[in-house]
Swiss-Prot record:
Phylogenetic classification of the source organism: Bacteria, Pseudomonadati, Pseudomonadota, Gammaproteobacteria, Vibrionales
Species of origin: Vibrio campbellii (strain ATCC BAA-1116)
Chief location: periplasm
A Pfam family: Peripla_BP_2
Name recorded for this polypeptide: Vitamin B12-binding protein
Boundaries of every Fe/B12 periplasmic-binding domain copy: 25-272
GO cellular component entries: periplasmic space
PANTHER family in UniProt: MOLYBDATE-BINDING PROTEIN MOLA, VITAMIN B12-BINDING PROTEIN
Length: 275
């Protein structure tokens, strides 16, 4: 389970290396980097992607050469890419080193901040025959982000708990992705000071911290879900401030993160209006 979560949640890292020229045969080894490649104007040059790369729609038709367990090293070499977009937090380092030994150019890309999304798009646009496509996409992202900041700017904080999985209960701590999305909307993470990036917690710990909002999976919120019996113990449940979020929007740092921001901010606004 933790391997799958790590594959879905990029850590902060990026390689600002410059392209020697336009790439013609590109392989992406993570879902978020596939989306960013399309934003950067590289979609028509992708020849293979990671197993969970399902957006945009045309990515589903591409050959799959990696997943949370590893990458298909021999197949990638056989495809003769002139650029691999790798993710050091999710792709095995030894296998990436082997790709480098074969002379395959690698762009290491895992952006874990809102500004980093735009920067990543700009950097990858350097590998496109039309870099202006990615530059425009990055500018539009920043403009929309600024508009959302003006719309939802507030110092009225809302405490929340974000549940990533049920068995075990995993959450996010510190400034690890997607914490910045919640902070952007005025959220205060009840596990912000956790020692691990994505710690395992107990129901008792959640009860003790009394979150005003609980973001959980649809299954966890069902009538017979894991939180049902704690309605009188957790403010979020007692006030019906329990919501599910689009996991792709919130967990992948891409242009669609703007949708996640709107979703989270609107939920927090609902809480503030009821106070």
């Amino acid at each position: 389970m933790m391997n799958k979560l790590c594959f879905a949640l990029p850590l902060i890292f990026s390689d600002a290396s410059f392209a020697n020229g336009p790439a013609q045969r590109i392989i992406s080894l993570a879902p978020h980097s596939t989306e960013i490649a399309y934003s950067a104007g590289l979609g028509d040059k992708l020849i293979a992607v990671s197993e969970m790369s399902d957006y945009p729609e045309q990515a589903k038709d591409l050959e799959k050469v990696s997943n949370y367990q590893g990458i298909k090293l021999e197949r990638i070499i056989a495809l003769q890419p002139d650029l691999v977009i790798a993710w050091p937090a999710g792709n095995p380092a030894k296998e990436l080193e082997k790709l480098e030994q074969f002379g395959i150019p690698i762009y290491y890309s895992t952006t874990g901040t809102l500004e980093g999304i735009a920067t990543n798009i700009e950097q990858l646009s350097q590998y496109s025959e039309k870099p202006e496509v990615g530059q425009k996409a990055a500018a539009e992202f920043r403009a929309q982000l600024e508009a959302l900041k003006e719309k939802y700017n507030t110092e009225d904080k809302v405490s929340y708990f974000y549940q990533l999985s049920e068995k075990p209960i995993i959450t996010v701590a510190g400034k690890n992705w997607p914490s910045e999305v919640f902070t952007f909307c005025g959220g205060e993470n009840i596990f912000s000071k956790g020692s691990a990036p994505y710690p395992q917690v107990s129901i008792e710990q959640v009860i003790t911290r009394q979150p005003e909002v609980l973001f959980a999976s649809r299954h966890a919120m069902s009538n017979d879900g894991m939180w049902a019996e704690w309605k009188n113990d957790i403010p979020a449940l007692g006030n019906n401030h329990v919501w599910s979020l689009n996991s792709d929007w919130i967990n992948r740092p891409t242009s669609r993160t703007l949708n996640a921001i709107t979703e989270v901010c609107e939920h927090f606004e609902t809480v503030r209006q009821k106070r």
